[in-house]
From Swiss-Prot:
Belongs to the TACO1 family. This is Probable transcriptional regulatory protein syc0529_d. One of its GO terms (molecular function) is DNA binding. GO terms for biological process: regulation of DNA-templated transcription. GO terms for cellular component: cytosol.
Length: 253
């Protein structure tokens, strides 16, 4: 198992906090809709839905909103004629960085137009289905927070259904198969590890290093824009940035 972190990917996706409460509610509601759509609408039998509900409650989303989101995902919400579907979009950012986007939409044309405009503004382009998805694979991701002793973590993971991990001073990210996510999260909690989040994520097979400051700035602006679009549920890119460039960019973005 290798232990090194790729900035601007998993950690970046989890560390960002939306400034507007409405955006937080919308994003968490979409997560519940997607989870209910992809599995059973019963949280006791659907780990992803149960996790999404826990996040929603922690953010202060009212129970009525949670129930509506689950019903919408299950297709049982009365009085709402909109039909939502999960759609995956793919494209390239500056420097040829591959970007994979998961969206939940009731209007594909609107979503595609918004994505296309965002890509074009920062020098990228929205591509055809399949153009970059082969560069990613879906895995289970468990995020741990706080100081983690690598030797102790590695010893624990040898007896758990983990495939690999990334570790730095702020915590660790442990990867596993889709089927093992619930078991891994539960067992890490039982061992006393501070599990902050557990979810399915698209992970790049390889990362592309970008060292040019302007290209990196355009890429991060593009990712920020994509993440705030109404229909977007998640954004993943095969981007890696040198630590010194990260430090320089943090002061300007």
């Amino acid at each position: 198992m290798a232990g090194h972190s790729k900035w601007a990917n998993i950690k970046r996706q989890k560390a960002r906090v939306d400034a507007k409460k409405a955006q937080v509610f919308a994003r968490l509601s979409r997560a519940m809709i997607v989870a209910a759509r992809q599995g059973l609408p019963d949280p006791a039998a659907n780990f992803q839905l149960r996790t999404a509900i826990e996040k929603a409650k922690a953010a202060g989303i009212p129970n009525d909103n949670i129930e509506r989101a689950i019903a919408k995902g299950a297709g049982t919400l009365s009085g709402d004629g909109r039909q939502f579907e999960s759609v995956r979009y793919e494209g390239y950012g500056p420097s040829g960085i591959a970007i994979l986007i998961e969206a939940l939409t009731d209007n594909r044309n609107r979503t595609a137009a918004n994505l296309r405009a965002a890509f074009s503004k920062q020098g990228g382009n929205l591509g055809e289905t399949g153009c970059v998805s082969w560069m990613f694979r879906q895995r289970g991701v468990v995020q741990l927070t706080g100081a983690i002793a690598e030797a102790d973590l590695l010893k624990a993971l040898l007896d758990l259904p983990a495939e690999s991990y990334d570790l730095d001073e702020s915590g660790a990210i442990v990867y596993c198969s889709i089927a093992d996510l619930e078991a891994l999260s539960t067992q890490l909690r039982q061992l006393g590890y501070p599990v902050e989040d557990s979810e399915l994520r698209w992970i790049p097979n390889d990362y592309q290093l970008v060292t040019d400051g302007e290209q990196a700035r355009s890429l991060l602006r593009l990712l920020d824009t994509l993440e705030t679009l109404e229909d977007v549920c998640s954004v993943t890119a095969n981007l890696e940035l040198p630590p010194e460039l990260v430090t320089a960019l943090e002061a300007t973005l």
